[in-house]
Amino acid sequence: MLSQNNNALGIIFPNSYDNTVPELVTERTMASIPFAGRYRMVDFILSSMANCGISNVSIVVRKNYHSLMDHLGTGREWDMARRHGGLNIVPPFAEKGVRIYSGRVEALGSILNFLENQKEKYVVMSDANIAVNYDFNALLAAHQASGADVTIAYQKVEIPEGRKNDNYTLTVDADGRVTELLFNDYRSGKQNLDLNIYVLEREILIKLVKDAAARGLIYFERDILAHNVNILNIRALEYTGYVAHVCDMKSYFDENLKLIDEKNLNALFPKQSPVYTKIRDDNPVRYVTGSRVESSILADGCVIEGTVENSVLFRGVRVKKGAVVKNCVLMQDTVVEPNAELDCVVTDKNVKITAGKKLSGTESFPVYVQKNHIV
């Protein structure tokens, strides 16, 4: 990890976009959804911050955060187990009879005292619905050079039909200034998609949050940024690297399988910027005589006796003799019994597929099996 004093603290919102993947967040947050064989979604943003020398990071949780706390622990894997700063899990603060926050402004309002007591000049904020290896130092440098009040990271991309809900797009002029911020933009063609990564001065953030809270506003993008594009100096920085967006079950399925392509895998996991995660001591993958594996990602602890094709298998998955797994994403400790057949299936943790069972979805509608279920 880089040792660099960039004078910035990080804030991650793990529950943002929980509503887009309800199947996967009944007992967890978006941030703790398993991804890419052995990681969680939060690992990517948190590792990016760690690699850029941001060592004071707060994760502002809302609900279902026990699995996230278990995964992050003290933050040791990210070099954030520190007496001063380090990794902080901030629970929802709500008085009796007061609802827990729903928008980013309310979330920030609940930690205003914390923000006011910090020493860093800048704040970088992010959600956890994207897997990206992001250079926050480049964002900070661009922000400082432009003299902006707020700088937004964006990606120029064509948003598929059916995935345009809960997205913000930007109109950016030739000087990089944001002139318009749109919610649920249904225009066709490539758009400037807001990656929900922001940097601004801590004092400016505190002022914006206080002003918004006084007026009963709750959404950072919609209520603050969009309504103040002509008042605030809002700049945008394009990101041209690899981004995996998780916005529904299909995208979760697709983005995992895309990593089977070595080009995509190397783009998300460059050697110079590693992604850290909770360590689990497992044996290497064991391939039993007669097994067959093609074009797949297999994490440590897997035992393969049958056939696996074009699939992503998380830690501890077992595919027994005669079983066939194709185009699947099987989470931790899934067991596929003898002669079962799976095609276009997503299993959550600790699922058991009984002997001879056949499950088949499609690329557009993969079958999902809930955590701890037996089929």
Put a short name on every predicted segment.
Residues 1-257, 369:
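Unchanged
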Residues 1-14, 203, 211-375:
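Left-handed beta-helix
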